[in-house]
Amino acid sequence: MKVRASVKKLCRNCKIIRREGVVRVICSAEPRHKQRQG
């Protein structure tokens, strides 16, 4: 998982979600696209 100041969708399968006040990107197609804002 990447921790970034600015999270962006990296492909069309990426979804931006907010979990417990933390913005995250989850991706079903490419697990390397997982990100967390921090």
Curated annotation (Swiss-Prot):
GO cellular component: cytoplasm; ribonucleoprotein complex; ribosome
BP GO terms, sorted: translation
InterPro entries: Ribosomal_bL36, Ribosomal_bL36_sp
Matches recorded under SUPFAM superfamilies: Ribosomal protein L36
GO molecular function, one term: structural constituent of ribosome
Keyword Ribosomal protein: yes
Any single Pfam family the record assigns to this protein: Ribosomal_L36
Keyword field contains Lipid metabolism: no
Keywords: Ribonucleoprotein, Ribosomal protein
Similarity section: Belongs to the bacterial ribosomal protein bL36 family.
Name listed for the protein in its UniProt record: Large ribosomal subunit protein bL36
Species the sequence originates in: Pseudomonas putida (strain ATCC 47054 / DSM 6125 / CFBP 8728 / NCIMB 11950 / KT2440)
Origin organism lineage: Bacteria, Pseudomonadati, Pseudomonadota, Gammaproteobacteria, Pseudomonadales
GN (gene name): rpmJ
